[in-house]
UniProtKB/Swiss-Prot annotation:
Gene3D superfamilies the record matches: GHMP Kinase, N-terminal domain, K Homology domain, type 1, Nucleic acid-binding proteins
Gene behind the chain: pnp
A GO term for molecular function: 3'-5'-RNA exonuclease activity
Annotated organism of origin: Nostoc punctiforme (strain ATCC 29133 / PCC 73102)
GO terms (BP aspect): mRNA catabolic process; RNA processing
Annotated residues for binding of Mg(2+): 496, 502
E.C. numbers: 2.7.7.8
Residue ranges annotated for the KH domain, each copy included: 563-622
Cofactor dependency: Mg(2+)
Primary role: Involved in mRNA degradation. Catalyzes the phosphorolysis of single-stranded polyribonucleotides processively in the 3'- to 5'-direction.
Protein name: Polyribonucleotide nucleotidyltransferase
Top-tier EC class: transferase
Annotated keywords: Cytoplasm, Magnesium, Metal-binding, Nucleotidyltransferase, RNA-binding, Transferase
Superkingdom of this protein's organism: Bacteria
All copies of domain S1 motif, residue ranges: 632-700
Length: 718
C-alpha cells in the first residue's frame, strides 16, 4: 500500500495520520500522532467462527514504557499485567466500534493499539479510538463508519478540543465523545457538578470536531483507492424461524403484558414456552425440514426467541407507552436504603435496593501509605487516594460460574462509580485518609453501576467522610423505531439487553459528576441525548430524596476501628533525621509507639494508629526531634551519662546536651556524681548552641513557673 501522510488541525494542534509505514501484514494499520504522542493501531480479520451467535471482536490497547523513556521495574524488567488504565482504554475503543459492525458478522476481528511514544501533553486514548476506525476501513472489514472521537475540556468558560493533561487537571470537565456520520455513538465524562446545559453544549461542541475527523477519514479512503465496505447479510432460510414465530409469538406477547410478573417469574414463563417448542421440534420426524434445520443450527431457537421477545417488548413501549413491569416511561422502580448494615469493624456500609437490583457498598479508611502507587504505568510518581472496586458474583443473577479475578466489565463499572464520586470527596488536607470503596452486587436487574454510586454515597456518609454533597445515579434507555423514539428511565435488565441505549448519569442536586452513554445503533441526535440527560435529572433527584431520608449528612465520628490520623509538617531537611540511617530511627519510633508513620517529600508527616494516644506519642517524639532550639528554652530531661566535667541530658527525643559541672548548681560542686546520677530527671535550660551544633545546658536561672511548665509538657509527651 502506498504511504500517505495527512494532517488535520484543531485549535492549532495537529493530528497526523500515517498509512503504509508500519505493520504491512496487518489487515489495516495507521500511525496516528499528535505532539510527541504516537499510537499504532491495527485491525485484522480472520476466518468466521462456526456455531457462535455473536461478533467475536477483541480490542487490546497497550502502553510500552519505552514510549515514555522508561525501563519497567521488577526482576523481569518488562511489561507485565496491564494496568487498569489500559483496560479502560480498551473498553473506550471497543464501545463505539462494536455497534458499527454488521449484526450478522461472525468473523474473528482483532483491533490492537500500541502507544509507541508518549509526551506529557497529549493523552493517547482518543487517538487510539479514531485510529481503530481508520485501521478497520483500510482492512476493508464491513463497517458502518467512519467513526472518530475527541476529548472536550472546559477551562474557565471555554471548551477545548483534545486538551492537554494540565488543561484536563485544571478544568471542570473531561468528556470524550465519539460519533459516526449517523450521530453521537458514545459519551464518557467526568465533571465537577456541571449543569445539564453545559454537558449538552460540550457534546455538541465535540461532535463538530468529530465530523471533521470523519471527513478526513473519508478523504483518506478515497485517496487510497478504497471504499467503505457495506456487505449484504448472508441469506438465511426462514423456514425454522417462521415455525418458531408462529408458535411462540402469541404466548410471548401475553407474558410480556403480565405486569405483575417479577423478573424470575417472567424468565421462567418464557423458558417454559421455549422448552415446549424445543420438545415439539424434537418430536418431528428426523427428515422433517424443521428438525433438520434446528439440528444444523442449535442457536436458532434461542436467537429467534430473543428476536420475538425484543419485538413485542419494543412495540408495547412504542405503541402503549408501557413497560414489561407496568411502569411509565419516566418512572423509577421502588427504592430503599440502609446504612450501618455491617458492624463498625467495617468503617462504613450502605445497602441500596432498587427492587431486584441490590448493591452493598463498604467504605474502608486507610493511611497515606495505603494509597495505590501508579508508578508501574505511564503516570510517574502518582498515587490514588480514592479506590473504588466493583464485584459482580454469579449468584447476583442466579447463575453458577467460576469465581475469577475482575474482568473488563467489573473494572469499567468500578471506574465509572469512582469517577462519579471523586468531585465530592474532601481534599487531602481536610481528610487525609485513603478511601477504598467496594461495591458488592448481591442482586442484578439492571443499572448496578449506578446502584454502586448510590450505595457508595451511603457508605461514605456512614463512615464519616465529609463529602461535599451526596451523589445519586440513574441509567436511561432508548427504544428507537424509525422516527419513533421512547426514552426509558431506570432501565431493568431486559430493557438494557433488548434496547438501543445504556445511558448512565450520576450527579448531585447541583449538577452532573459523571456520565457514560453507549449505543447499539449507529448514532443518535443531540436532541434525543438532551432529552435523556434532562429526564435523568428528575430520576437522580427522586433517588437522592430516598437516600437522604436514610442518612442526610455524614456522621461526625469515624468508626472506632478506623485509624486515627495526625498530621504535622517538618522541614524537609529534617526528613533524614526522622528516618535515620537505614530507617533505624523511624522503625524505633514505630516499635516504641505502635503507630504507623508516612513521610512525604515536602515534609508532611502522617501518623496513624487505631489508639489515638499511640499516634500522639509518636507525634510528640517526632516534634521533639525536629524542634528548633533557642537559647533560654526550658525542658525536663533525664541524665544519660556522666563524665568528669559534666553530665549529658536527653531532653527531647534525639536531642542531647551537656551540663558543665559549673552549671549543675549555684554553689561549687566537687564531683558530678555528688549532684546527679544516671537516670535522674532534671530541669534544664538551653544556655548555648555553639557553631558545631553542640548544646550546652544549665540548671541555673530557671524560674519555678518555667520548671512547672517543663514538667507538665514532659508528662504530656510521655
Amino acid at each position: 500500500m502506498a504511504e500517505v501522510d495527512k494532517s488535520i488541525s484543531f485549535d492549532g494542534r495537529d493530528i497526523r495520520l500515517k498509512v503504509g509505514l508500519l505493520a504491512p501484514q496487518a489487515g489495516g494499520s495507521v500511525l496516528i500522532e499528535s505532539g510527541d504522542t504516537s499510537v499504532l493501531v491495527t485491525a485484522t480479520r480472520s476466518q468466521a467462527r462456526e456455531g457462535i451467535d455473536f461478533l467475536p471482536l477483541t480490542v487490546d490497547y497497550e502502553e510500552r514504557l519505552y514510549a515514555a523513556g522508561r525501563i519497567p521495574g521488577g526482576i523481569m524488567r518488562r511489561e507485565g499485567r496491564p494496568p487498569e488504565k489500559t483496560i479502560l482504554t480498551s473498553r473506550l475503543i471497543d464501545r463505539p466500534m462494536r455497534p458499527l459492525f454488521p449484526s450478522w458478522l461472525r468473523d474473528d476481528l482483532q483491533i490492537i493499539a500500541l502507544t509507541l511514544s508518549m509526551d506529557e501533553l497529549v493523552p493517547p486514548d482518543v487517538l487510539a479510538v479514531t485510529g481503530a476506525s481508520i485501521a478497520t476501513l483500510i482492512a476493508q472489514i464491513p463497517f458502518n463508519g467512519p467513526m472518530a472521537a475527541v476529548r472536550v475540556g472546559l477551562v474557565g468558560d471555554d471548551f477545548i478540543i483534545n486538551p492537554t493533561y494540565a488543561e484536563i487537571e485544571a478544568g471542570d470537565l473531561d468528556l470524550v465523545v465519539a460519533g459516526s456520520p449517523h450521530g453521537v455513538i458514545m459519551v464518557e465524562a467526568g465533571a465537577n457538578q456541571l449543569p445539564e446545559r453545559d454537558i449538552i453544549e460540550a457534546i455538541d461542541f465535540g461532535y463538530e470536531a468529530v465530523r471533521d475527523l470523519i471527513k478526513a477519514q473519508q478523504d483518506l479512503v478515497a485517496e487510497l483507492g478504497l471504499v467503505i465496505v457495506q456487505e449484504a447479510p448472508p441469506e438465511v432460510d426462514q423456514t425454522l424461524e417462521n415455525y418458531i414465530r408462529d408458535r411462540a409469538s402469541g404466548q410471548i406477547k401475553k407474558i410480556l403484558s403480565q405486569f405483575t410478573f417479577t423478573k424470575p417469574e417472567r424468565d421462567a414463563a418464557l423458558d417454559v414456552v421455549k422448552d415446549e417448542i424445543a420438545t415439539t421440534i424434537k418430536e418431528l420426524p428426523e427428515e422433517d425440514p424443521i428438525r433438520v434445520a434446528a439440528t444444523a443450527n442449535n442457536k436458532a431457537l434461542g436467537n429467534t426467541f430473543k428476536d420475538i421477545t425484543k419485538y413485542f417488548m419494543r412495540r408495547q413501549i412504542i405503541e402503549d407507552n408501557v413497560r414489561v413491569d407496568g411502569r411509565k416511561l419516566d418512572e423509577v422502580r421502588r427504592v430503599s436504603c440502609l446504612v450501618g448494615v455491617l458492624p463498625k469493624r467495617v468503617h462504613g456500609s450502605g445497602l441500596f435496593n432498587r427492587e431486584l437490583t441490590q448493591v452493598l457498598s463498604t467504605c474502608t479508611l486507610g493511611t497515606p501509605g495505603d494509597a495505590q502507587n501508579l508508578n508501574d504505568d505511564m503516570q510517574l510518581d502518582q498515587h490514588k487516594r480514592y479506590l473504588h472496586h466493583y464485584n459482580f458474583p454469579p449468584f447476583s443473577v442466579g447463575e453458577t460460574k467460576p469465581m475469577r479475578s475482575p474482568g473488563r466489565r467489573e473494572i469499567g463499572h468500578g471506574a465509572l462509580a469512582e469517577r462519579s464520586l471523586i468531585p465530592v470527596l474532601p481534599s487531602k488536607e481536610q481528610f487525609p485518609y485513603v478511601i477504598r470503596i467496594v461495591s458488592e452486587v448481591l442482586s442484578s436487574n439492571g443499572s448496578t453501576s449506578m446502584g454502586s454510586v448510590c450505595g457508595s454515597t451511603l457508605a461514605l456518609m456512614d463512615a464519616g467522610v465529609p463529602i461535599l454533597k451526596p451523589v445519586s445515579g440513574a441509567a436511561m434507555g432508548l427504544i428507537k423505531d424509525g422516527d419513533e423514539v421512547r426514552i426509558l428511565t431506570d432501565i431493568q435488565g431486559i430493557e438494557d439487553f433488548l434496547g438501543d441505549m445504556d445511558f448512565k448519569v450520576a450527579g448531585t442536586d447541583t449538577g452532573i459528576t459523571a456520565l457514560q452513554m453507549d449505543m447499539k445503533i449507529p448514532g443518535l441526535s443531540l436532541d434525543v441525548i438532551s432529552q435523556a440527560v434532562h429526564q435523568a435529572k428528575a430520576a437522580r433527584l427522586h433517588i437522592l430524596e430516598k437516600m437522604l431520608a436514610c442518612i442526610d449528612t455524614p456522621r461526625i465520628e469515624t468508626s472506632p476501628y478506623a485509624p486515627r490520623l495526625l498530621t504535622i509538617k517538618i522541614d524537609s531537611d529534617m526528613i533524614g533525621l526522622v528516618i535515620g540511617p537505614g530507617g533505624k530511627t523511624i522503625k524505633g519510633i514505630t516499635e516504641e509507639t505502635g503507630a504507623k508513620i508516612d513521610i512525604e517529600d515536602d515534609g508532611t508527616v502522617t501518623i496513624s494508629a487505631v489508639d489515638e494516644n499511640k499516634a500522639k506519642r509518636a507525634r510528640n517524639i517526632i516534634q521533639g526531634m525536629t524542634r528548633k532550639l533557642h537559647e533560654g528554652d526550658v525542658y525536663a530531661g533525664r541524665i544519660t551519662r556522666i563524665i568528669p566535667i559534666g553530665a549529658f541530658v536527653e531532653f527531647l527525643p534525639g536531642k542531647e546536651g551537656m551540663i558543665h559541672i559549673s552549671q549543675l548548681a549555684d554553689y561549687r560542686v566537687g564531683k558530678v556524681e555528688d549532684e546527679v546520677a544516671v537516670g535522674d530527671e532534671v530541669i534544664i535550660k538551653v544556655r548555648e548552641i555553639d557553631n558545631k551544633g553542640r548544646i550546652n545546658l544549665t540548671r541555673l536561672g530557671i524560674h519555678p513557673d518555667q520548671a512547672a511548665a517543663a514538667r507538665e509538657a514532659a508528662a504530656v509527651n510521655r
